[in-house]
A protein has these predicted regions:
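A short LG(V/I)-centered, amphipathic sequence patch enriched
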Residues: 41-63
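Short helix-boundary/capping micro-motifs
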Residues: 11-32, 53
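Secondary-structure junction motif
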Residues: 106-108, 185-186, 194-218, 285-287, ...
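Short beta-strand-centered segments that line the small-molecule binding cleft or hinge
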Residues: 110-114, 130-173, 182, 239-242, ...
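Alpha-helical linker/hinge and terminal dimerization helices associated
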Residues: 7, 43-44, 65-87, 100
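N-terminal winged-helix
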Residues: 81, 88-119, 123-127, 132-136
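Hydrophobic/proline-rich hinge and linker segments of small-molecule sensing/allosteric domains
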Residues: 160-201, 270-280, 293
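A late-sequence structural motif
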Residues: 250-251, 260-302
């Protein structure tokens, strides 16, 4: 008989990339993990994983089984949360993810603060994640809502994705950089010789992907710096002189004092922020979405 624990362990092994990392994340011994997966395979009657010396691969049966196992676990978590929310009569927990390039300042902060003031029985749990990871966790029930940067590379049919506003992109650079002395906006083509502290990941969209699109439109691909970051720590790398980056204007609010910001000459130098949530989610999530879309201050959309 297949158990939920076996499903959970199987999915975690695949998403973690192997038994060792999954065991660390689950706080169980690898031997126990292996035993549960073998029992799952015995119950199904066919192998789901190929165990190599360094990595684990899905068999054809495993590839067919994985999305259904993920969906089952996500549906179970959604059902559990819905029952708890109904029983708590307006009280509950909302798990909100946000990209590192979507700092919760200004209008976003005001909207969150306003929601919590109206819904005094609700708690928010905030997690900083990449746009693509947010979508995966939303689809699988590990997050309730996500604030992310477009574009995203994967479409999830079970998710709503609502663009909220466009935000100007600025050139972030060290205060002593020669370009920081300019008064006129900087053309993207002038950055062809610069090194960038954030470049696209092959399997992620978001801000770095959008920045690379703009650079390609100006005739070059961003040259990687020797020190790279996909988090807000890129501002510290810029401050240290490792390179430059295209960042949203809202990141000025969290930047070190030795980082300067320059306007870009191109009208298309902007990035979009979006809100994501599951289509079949709970009244608590739907209530948050309705409030958030109606009460996001205008300055967040400028």
């Amino acid at each position: 008989m297949i158990s939920l624990r076996q499903l959970h362990y199987f999915v975690e092994i695949v998403e973690s990339g192997g038994f060792s990392r999954a065991a660390e994340r689950l706080f169980v011994a690898q031997s126990a993990l292996s035993r549960q997966v073998r029992e799952l395979e015995d119950s199904i009657g066919t192998p789901l994983l190929r165990r190599g010396p360094r990595q684990v691969e899905l068999t054809p049966a495993g590839r067919a089984f994985l999305p259904r196992a993920q969906r089952l676990l996500g549906d179970l978590e959604a059902a559990r949360r819905l029952a708890r929310e109904v029983g708590e009569d307006g009280h509950g927990l909302l798990r909100l993810g946000h990209s590192s390039s979507v700092p919760l300042v200004g209008g976003l902060q005001a909207a969150l603060r306003g929601y919590l003031a109206v819904q005094s029985g609700v708690r928010l749990e905030l997690t900083q994640q990449s746009s693509e990871q947010q979508l995966a966790d939303l689809a699988e029930g590990r997050l309730d809502l996500g604030l992310l940067r477009l574009p995203v590379l994967r479409q999830h049919p079970r998710l709503h994705l609502r663009a909220l506003y466009r935000e100007p992109l600025l050139l972030a650079l060290a205060a002593d950089h020669p370009l920081a002395r300019r008064e006129a906006p900087v053309a993207l083509a002038a950055l062809a010789g610069e090194t960038f502290v954030s470049i696209p990941h092959l399997q992620r969209g978001g801000l770095s992907y959008r920045a690379a699109e703009l650079c390609l439109g100006a005739g070059f691909y961003p040259r990687p710096a020797r020190a790279l970051s996909r988090k807000t720590s890129q501002l510290q790398l810029i401050e240290a002189g490792f390179g430059v980056a295209l960042v949203p204007a809202s990141m000025r609010a969290i930047a070190p004092p030795a980082v300067s910001f320059m306007s870009l000459a191109e009208a298309e130098a902007y990035s979009e922020v979006a809100l994501a949530w599951r289509r079949d989610d709970s009244p608590l999530v739907e209530g948050f979405v309705e409030y958030f879309l109606e009460n996001l201050p205008n300055e967040a959309k400028d």
